[in-house]
Amino acid sequence: MRTTLFLIFIGIMIAFSACRSDFNFESSTGNLGFSRDTVYLDTVFTDIGSSTYTLKVYNKSDNNISIPKVQLAKGAASKYRMTVDGMTGLDGDNSGIGDGKIFDNVELLAKDSLFIFIETTANIADANPTDFLYTDQIQFGSGSNLQKVELVTLIRDAYFIFPKRNEGIYEGVDFGFDENENVTQVRGRNLEAEHPVNGNEFEWNDDKPYVVYGYAAVPTDKTLNINAGARVHFHAESGMIVQDGATLNINGLKSDTEALEKEVIFEGDRLEPFYSDVPGQWGFVYLRQGSSATIDHLTLKNASVGLYVLNNTGTIKIKNTQIYDCSNVGIFAIAANITGFNVAINTAGQATFAGTVGGNYDFTHCTFNNNWASSSQVAVLLNDYLEENDVEVASNTLNANFKNCIIYGSTSVSLLFDNSRSDFNTIFDHCLIKFNDSGTTLAGNELYNFIRDEQNGNIKNQNPKFFDIQNNNLNIDETSAAKGKGKFSFSDGTLDLNGFPRIIEPSDIGAYNFSVIPED
């Protein structure tokens, strides 16, 4: 039986070999087609690898061809690397694996195509000093049959903040306490006043971006100032921790609404346009118990949680701030003290603002909108207790004031209360709130009478007419139900989030004055 199977196998192999020999390949004459003549790799930070980009190569002729050489023009010195139809090319550095620079005799059947995948890791020093572009070519063939596809990448220099590693173990920073009151840590490092590469890490400016790996921690008794125009990019599972007794000051300034040149921006480190509104790319900014913060003109986007505020004794002051596309919560507060003015938060997995286990919260002229694709999300959640295994383990008084605010979203109820105490104190004054409790467990709950009966100048279930929710534009147009429905005493002498004065009485509800939608 074994002899028979062996003979069958040999016969198949001989037949296959005989068929394969019928494929005759002639040298390419330079008539290849390409899916594009230039491959633009989006902006990358110095020494950080890019995403992978694709080029498709077509043989439109009726003949099988062999391309004598596919190579990068800069050869082994190129900062680009390729795979060609799964091949890694010649092993120029004797590593045992092709280095993705040079490929000999690449075969391509008639009327067929192949894929080339391209990546780069380049240093700012490799780029053109006038425009910071790093370029090369993919060359196909040679001599009179030579064809080229250009490669272009913009390189950005940056300050890099990352934990040290010793024998495979990363440096860590204090994060909290476990159930036995032991200190827990996460991967990261403390900022330094005299870092050997970055200099004073307690003053972040706009000369070049900051890229954070792990958690950048502001130590006790230290202050981090992030000044106008600064750009901060966080890698996956990275963020910032402000320790007990430390201070965070974000000092952005009014900017052009498109250029945002003086705005401070926190976002992920993937610079390709595709990632500009992808939630959950990095961790959070964690303001620990005993920390303090003043935040002005910050745009924070694509985090898991934007601001995570734990039981702070001082007041966290937030104004003129936008928080977008968080996969969990925009601002997650636990027994915290927060004041907010001109804050706009759009779309989060669970809530745009969650004030939990009590605390003191005061928001004026803020817009909370949640259009996350989930039936359980809300715009604002207020809660005064914590349960573990169905046992209440903590509770605190809640004091929450919302004045001239929009609380809206795609679900029928955008405001949710969850209380166990009688000192659950809320005031909503001249707010636009989406609240349709018909058929829900909230029907008849007296805590919601203020909006159910539209008391205290509040209005319910009317459309604020945001400009463009999908693109995080929460400006309101001239037909908005929020136009002229605010209480002017909360507005007098102030500017809206765009920097326009609130001078018309009655004022508009939310972070923005009404405006006319610009024509395309």
Q: Model regions: which residues?
A:
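C-terminal motif of bacterial Sec signal peptides marking the signal peptidase cleavage site
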Residues: 15-18
